[in-house]
Amino acid sequence: MTTMAVDERFQNGAQDYAAYLEKPEGRLRTDLAFANLEDFLPRLQAEKSLCALDVGCGTGATAIRLARLGMRVTLLDSSPAMLDIAKRTAQEAGVTDKIVLQHGDATRLTSLLQSASFDVILCHNVLEYLDDPIAVLCGAARALRDSSAILSVLVRNRAGEVFKAAIQAGDLAIAENNLTADWAQESLYGGRVRLFTSDSLQAIFKAGSLAVIAERGVRVVADYLPSRVSRAAEYERIFELERKLSSRPEYAPVARYTQCFARLASSPIEDGP
């Protein structure tokens, strides 16, 4: 998959993506991932402003939340259309003084950013679109400030795609194929996306000189609720249930998305709250 092809997908799909984030499933993905992230954020210090980087920031939904916490945030994306939406959203939120917009390719972080510059790095729903996710993680590792800095990665979970095909779509052939597939088809942008397992994630983090300190599941059951349950009206209850499921080892492995938190490999390994 070429970088240009990916850029075109994001550029042409920017408005559709913004609309998706307003739907319950889009809100849940963003809200749950951010709630998980808050458990691992470095402590804010009055005398020091933390610096964050959002790789593949999209419309800036998560980055702007970090800016509201007082962080200085660099928003990096390959799509000018996405960055335009992020800029407008930042203006509406009144945080333009806290953000820097940067057009660039996630696989070229080492040439775009100074080393040891960021306390928090996000890479949410980016790696599944790329042929070389290790290049992104190597660049992110280089950009982490020190052993206390945190990297949050959100990816599409292979097990979740099996359940989606079988339960939501009722397509047993695709479900069976997804049991071993490295790639699947997605509908938002159109085209293929990489599927990850816990083992494959551990391997690419290790290759990037990073150590995973925790894994969380994002959207474990919400996608499969019957029609009588309104995702809009019952949003808060669904959110709270998902939060409880996200760290439970018997449930999280079948979530639609897997969220990993990592530090530089020399850091001590300890789970969060």
Language-model region placement:
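Short alpha-helix
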Residues: 192-209, 215
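A short glycine-rich, Lys/Arg-flanked "PGG" loop and its adjoining helix->strand segment in the class I
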Residues: 134-150
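A C-terminal cap/extension of S-adenosyl-L-methionine-dependent methyltransferases
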Residues: 214-270
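Conserved class I S-adenosyl-L-methionine
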Residues: 1-56, 61, 65, 85, 150-179, ...
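A conserved beta-strand element that flanks and buttresses the S-adenosyl-L-methionine
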Residues: 122
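Class I SAM-dependent methyltransferase SAM/SAH-binding core
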Residues: 53, 61-108
